[in-house]
Amino acid sequence: MDADVVVVGAGLAGLVAAAELADAGRRVIILDQEPAASVGGQAFWSFGGLMFVDSPEQRRLRVHDSPELALADWLGSAGFDRPEDYWPRQWAEGYVEFAAGEKRAWLARQGMRWFPIVQWAERGGYGVSASGAHGNSVPRFHLTWGTGPGVLEPFLRRVRTAVDNGTIELRFRHRVTALATHDGAVTGVTGETLAPSNVPRGVRSTREVVGDFAVGAQAVIVASGGIGGNHELVRRNWPASWGAAPTHMISGVPDHVDGAMLGVTERAGGRVINADRMWHYPEGILNHSPVWTAHGIRILSGPSPLWLDPGGERLPPPLFPGFDSLGALRHITGAGYDYSWLVLDRRTLSTEFALSGSEQNPDLTGKDIRQVIGRARGGPTGPVQAFLDRGPDFVVRPTVAELAKGMNELTGTDLIDAKTLRRLVQARDQQVSSGLGKDPQVVATAAARRYIGDRLTRIVRPHRFLDASGDPLVAVRCHVLTRKTLGGLETDLSARVLRSDGQPLPGVYAAGEAAGFGGGGVHGYRALEGTFLGGCLFSGRIAGRAAAAAVA
């Protein structure tokens, strides 16, 4: 044997698993098809949000959370309704217990810290029923100080220490194409060696094959990510209930997120479940400085902007920004569209627009307290201003008529009627001016401002978009942005990959997005956010510890 365990994928889940294996004294080889510059995978590019339950940060903000409430929110959002959801549901229960228990202390011991204001993602808005409902009842999205790189740092440090002492070996440009088996058990991997590449992180690397390889091991952990960079696979798995898959989508993940290892593991006997469950965003914008193919960025908007379909009609309640990502996506694509509009004024944008991603938040990523405090002075952040100035999806005009004209020019259509758009904005402004209002979005926004975190940093003071200040109006074309795979390799609570007969595939484990973040789909149909990095941490830790025990 070349190693005790082979880990396929040098993203967050793979690094966590490898670090746990090394701590247990196991010899590990990590294989990844990308160059060394891309170590950390998708997690590097992330905003660094983590879900905690009843955290010190929540309590300081007078947010009352509990494991029982979090699990009710999770199950209401997941909507588990299939026989295949047996293991995903158990993983969900375990994850909520982890998020309410040792998760924060475990990460804090490794040096991780969090921004003091907890964000409120996926607010739901469908009301409460006996069967539950989607959304976070309270804010739970904790921003890691350092964003995605800050989440990676402790595990990269542990892995590099193990590399230095000879416990772990990192082999980049190694693409696994098969799991090696003997007498029904997996005994390692085989694959192709790719040509060296010095492209920067995230840039598409060459797929030129220069050789082949084989690595023998007692166990293999598949931590290779999902399918978000492979639009062909996304369309193949697109559920009919969402309408036809869009002909045009943009990518929220690099090209290497291709889903290839799911097929490799299936061919060896592993079972993929819930492949039609995915988590794509309807608020994607084209990056003015793209790194990968069709590079898109997600807008993290507060709830005040009007959300319109391509014909200028408002999305129905509660499909407001930040309330129900899947509901909004399904409404848009179900009507045959592949884009929508956010309409607001510049004052609202300055407070309510943030951008997802480590590179779009250099103050938080760089741990620059002075820059973070500078956000309170008002005005858009530097990255948001860059999109206002250079973003191909932004239309900024002084009047409604000119805004409508610009929207039509951008799309090459005449779908937006200026008079109808003016009436819509005026009707919204009347509701805001009343001080109370009956419009569901105005009411929901006022309710959200009761939370001090939103009132201080996230939601602008209610005001008319068409007022005497002369503030310009903004329309943003939002594309469908591919991102996460919610289904994946079915695993038991020890992260062992299961066969179609429900028995473990000997010697194979899976973690992270490749395993649907646990069990083959821990989120069900919908996520609460802050749970993808967390799912990689949780499942990677379990896989590493379980494999270490199995090869002892």
PLM region descriptions:
Residues M1-V5, D23, V522, A549-A552:
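Extreme N-terminal leader/targeting segments of oxidoreductases
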Residues P196-H288, E529, L533-I542:
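Glycine-rich loop(s) and the adjacent beta-strand/alpha-helix scaffold that form part
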Residues D23-F44:
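Glycine-rich FAD pyrophosphate-binding loop
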Residues D414-G518, V522:
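A glycine-rich dinucleotide-binding beta-alpha-beta segment and adjacent secondary-structure elements
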Residues L262, A268-I416:
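An anion/pyrophosphate-binding glycine-rich loop and adjacent beta-alpha core
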Residues A92-F213, H231-E232, I285, V425-R461, ...:
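Conserved redox-cofactor binding core of oxidoreductases
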